[in-house]
Amino acid sequence: MFIGLTGTLCSGKHTIARYLIEAHQFQYITLTTDPRAKEFNALTFDSAKEIQEFTTKNWRSNYVICHISTANELNLYRKRPFFLLVAVDAPLIVRYNRWLSRNSLENNNPAMLANFVFESDALMYHSKKSYDSDMTIPVYKQAKLAELSILNPFDNVEELHKHLDSLDITNPDRLRPSWDTYFMLLSELAARRANCMKRRVGCILVKNNRVISTGYNGKPRNLKNCNDGGCERCNEGAKCGVDLGTCLCLHAEENALLEAGRERLEGPGHAILYCNTCPCLGCAKKIVQVGVQEVVYSQAYGMDEKTAEMFCEAGIQLRQHTPVSLSSELEGDSKLLSNALINHFQMTTDLFNP
């Protein structure tokens, strides 16, 4: 794995790089122009192309880089399927305090904050020509391309490390999805086609790891779409699970089951239904009837317990799977993260309201 860390000024990129080195045996790799190369005992190269070639030859090893400044560099690294771009950020006041500490400055000069904000914004938004005439890429553009975003408001390294452990950064699923992740992502893609104005649900029916059919929720064909006013129940804002009998929309699971047909699901092989939302009781009955052997879902729904009881009685395995690529940093150690943010906002309030 080759991890590229990008982020705002004093967000903690190098601290996270050190965590990867110490906890996961990564090697710091960078350009010879990186001023912190010696500090990390880094492998240094004269160009991004040389780094790309080296990591390609040694792709089974783990490397981390924090020095990505041009679009050309980033594009070279992103061509490789073992590269993961991670964006790091922290609240402004947190980064300012770190900046003061790094430069051994006292927080008693109002001009210091202005200097920091100017320096931070220059890194975040400013494009300029570098020494090799390649256009630099601002941090905000790099962050848009990141596969993972990390918020780092922590006061000490120990808490940050706990949070990073909970994020499971080095999970191979982030580079090449498992079958569960692959099909769940397909169900999320199918959900984008939903025309129900209440909820986006997508479903994938699979047998022996081969897609049989797909489905999403919305009105039957030749009828006005729900999001065009076609379903009175949905458009009147009925609560979850209420008046489902008057809903004119087909559920994603129903669409997928109708498309597949019972004959394609029965017989040798293992039929699995992937849905980004746990099936309702009405869909659960149909799933049992057609012979699906396993149901995998990502998001909970209001009827989960009743659905689970029916599947258990029918001998159908029900389990939850949320791909790491669909998880945000808040789904790591959320309590630890929330406490750190609360502490810093309290410090900010005390600072400006003495």
Give the predicted meaning of each segment.
Residues 4, 48-54, 68, 73-83, ...:
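Nucleotidyltransferase catalytic core that binds NTPs
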Residues 60-61, 81-82, 143-147, 153, ...:
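Short, well-ordered alpha-helix to beta-strand connector turns
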Residues 54-106:
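ATP-dependent NMP and nucleoside kinases share a basic, alpha-helical "lid"
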Residues 1-5, 58-66, 271:
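Generic beta-sheet signal
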Residues 71-74, 94-164:
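Small-molecule kinase domains that catalyze NTP-dependent phosphoryl transfer to phosphate-bearing small molecules
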Residues 19, 23-69, 73:
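ATP-dependent small-molecule kinase phosphotransfer cores
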Residues 76-77, 140-142, 286, 310:
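Hydrophobic/aromatic ligand-binding patch that stacks against planar heteroaromatic rings
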Residues 2-11, 15-33, 42-44, 93, ...:
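Zinc-dependent deaminase catalytic domain
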